[in-house]
Amino acid sequence: MLRHRNCLCEKTFKLVRLTSSRQRVLSFGFLTISPSNSLMEPKKSFNFLVFVVALSYIFSLYQVLALTPEGIILYALLFLLNFVFAFVVNDTAIAIKYLFVLMAMRAINLIYSLPLDEDAIRMFAGYRLLHGVNPYLPMPTVFNHYDVPIGLRTLTEYGGFVERLIYPGLSVFAGVAEYALGYVIFNVVIYVTFILISYVFLRNKSTEALIFAVLWLLFGGVNLATLLLTVGILLRKYNGFFVGLAISYNQLYTLIAPFLVIYYLAEGKKEVLRQVAYALFGFLITNVPFMVWDFKLWFSAMLYSVSQPIVPIGFSISRETYMGFFPIPFKVYEYLFITMYIASIVIYAIMFKIVAKWAYVFPAISMIAYPRTLLGYITSWLPPAFFFFFTRTEGNVKVAKLKPLGTAVLIAIMIMPIFVPALTSTDVNTPFTFKVTKVYVGTYGNVYKMSINATVYSPTVKNITFVVIPDFYPFYNTYLWWSTVNVTVGQNYFNITPLAPSQEIGFNNATYTVVGVYGPYYYFVTLVLVSNGTMFSNFTYTPKE
């Protein structure tokens, strides 16, 4: 059966076929198969392709669990149709089209949902720049000022995330556009532009881009950095310049640099110097204005962010650690990530000739310590860098052609859903508000209970988790106090206590942050406890212009 599927896949995809008197090579998206490459024999390669596609489905479906039942049913239906056509009917071409439908629906959810924390940071930077204020501030200060333009923030902000990621220059300028035009409009423009560029690449360079684009969008959507790297793919001689621009948009792209240097060393030292110079130029042109404005402030922000690893809060055991289920310090995840990442670079450098075609695998290995990063950022830098920069086919490439009708259907499937309502976002991300009405302090000044008054606006909110973060020890939180059940629309009153009856959060005369979590979002309340057990709640800070 597997042998039959391999033959069928080879006939159906017809992505890139190279013929010579001695060898025949078939390239699937990011896998190159040839008789001379024992690591990429057809059976293993096809199974790996199926595994990656299935993994993308799992991640994509997992992300919609906070959506409405209608949205979950829609995603499940698309997944079922794709599975049937791919593995039951054995019509891979139709399966690809349904894959694009699923990708498009995923993009709808991204476009019409509220911004991520990184987007909110950029919008705040754009807000300050539009008002003539230097946008470069330490991250804790940024979120003390946080009052624009949305009130929702994600779990990644506590535990160290926002204190360790500052916005580079291009991100600031993008934030101006996002704030002035609105995030939704800006994201739609990016999405459409990416589709057009991908289509040009698809028709004129290699139809490998078909599977690549699907997986790219299924995992993490499209942002400005992915567009920049796509342009860099089209203009390969200037890869470094566009990588530099991508780093100026999101510093996570610095993870590419060591692998790129090793890769270009194979082409000679001059090529390394040329690409590094391009990257520096691309990074500096958007950062020079802020360097001139206040170099010390800009430099301290850049140095602070790159010297502090990002804490991996997300859809993983690290999230449960953050929520208080596992008493594991966040430093464990940081050290694990750093160790695996460095090991990947060393292995790649030592075994370059053997593993050059598999370079994209190594960052994924290091992301085991960062499941949320793997989910959210894998397509921001991994596929464009390690598919197009490393897994290159050899010889004369004959580009497969799409029939006119198939091309029209493909474009319609990809673009049309942008202009319809967000079917999977109905009644999602509706905020709830809460305040702490009383804090209970024991005989010895220990806090053992809090009373919460929460107002819920959406019937889809079924569960709220309250987390208490002591400001005096914010990076090792073991205080998940209570998770609610059967939440109703309107007023809800809760008494939250530690998970363990003997556990107490801390002591009197200290400052705490209470986080009310539902789905991936929360509102925050800052508490100031005083000796008699009273407190100030709902603390806000208006940004100064």
Curated annotation (Swiss-Prot):
**Listed transmembrane segments:** 48-68, 69-89, 94-114, 181-201, 209-229, 242-262, 279-299, 336-356, 368-390, 404-424, 510-530
The listed locations are: Host membrane
Gene Ontology annotations for the cellular component aspect, listed alphabetically: host cell membrane; membrane
Entry annotated with the keyword Transmembrane: yes
Sorted alphabetically, the keyword list is:
Host membrane, Membrane, Transmembrane, Transmembrane helix
User: Any coiled-coil ranges, and where?
Assistant: none
Membrane disposition: Multi-pass membrane protein
- The protein's name is Putative transmembrane protein ORF545
